[in-house]
């Protein structure tokens, strides 16, 4: 049977590494407070890693979610059930019809997941897989959702999925925007939670305000991340217009 082996090697400069990660988490928290109104506590953000992932997987399995089983666990090592190829790989290689189906399935599954009051925390499209015609979720090391309100944690999940989807390699600009718009539409139709939408609108205002002055300078910059940022800002912009 196939499995996924995840290892973390303890660093020689572990104390210094923790200090740097704490400073980074602190800056993230301050930025989140300024722009989105919530302060994710750095100490909670840093309670992540393989042990945290094993705990979350056990909780989600108990709740009946489609996530991998933990087959073996020891310090700095997890052996997980293999739950199919990731959607990033599938979307890159499939035809347009299959891409649309996969995008709809991913958005609808996230909406159903959120409707149960759950959050992922690492909801990039590469962390969704397809097995037996159903969407599964992997990679639960990140702990940001534990220190945000439920609506903001879920809005952040959706942002992660959209941003990663529209930044995929082998998608031209038109296809990327089509898939991103479809994912947003399907999600909001399936989970019309006003609190999540309000958080998404706040996030959209921040992204659009940042994108406006940068666009003339970086419009032709050949970076998937930069162009993906502009695409997701454009996809979310109508939320502001309707508010």
Language-model regions, residue ranges each:
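Conserved short submotifs of the Hanks-type protein kinase catalytic core
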Residues: 75-87
